[in-house]
Amino acid sequence: ALIPSVIAFVQGNGDPSRYPMGFTIKADCKEEEKEFDFSKSLYFPQKQILCVNNHDILITHGHNEHIYSGLEQLYFKAQENFCKVVCYGHSHYPSNDYNKECTLINPGSCSLPRGGQPASFAILTAEDKFVDVAFIKIMESGFSLFNPVRFA
């Protein structure tokens, strides 16, 4: 069976929790007088848990889990939420870390890569019996698969 693509989004550090989708403009009002209609806004949660083909996947930005001090808090959050896969960001550094209970995936960054890594994103495939990740490097000439170097 063909399953549609799944898209999720979470709030990053410094991001507002809501983004207005529209605003009200009064006749002859100045730019600063526009009123945002927050009843029509996107809400960005701190985390999301998606179930894809019976795999619970935790999605979080990673700043609240203090990833620069290690990945232990991400492993703990996965265990706490009964997730076998965690997708996170914050470092803008692509990585695929795992232990016997959980896989941690950082897709890197399309616009602000760090640590000498290429601009990148990841495609996560969740089949019945396994989850696979492919890292895609963005180049001027197109796209290419690559294996990220382990985050140090």
Where are these regions (language model features)?
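Conserved catalytic scaffold of divalent metal-dependent phosphoesterases
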Residues: 1-110, 126-128
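Binuclear metal-dependent phosphoesterase catalytic core
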Residues: 46, 53, 81-82, 105-152
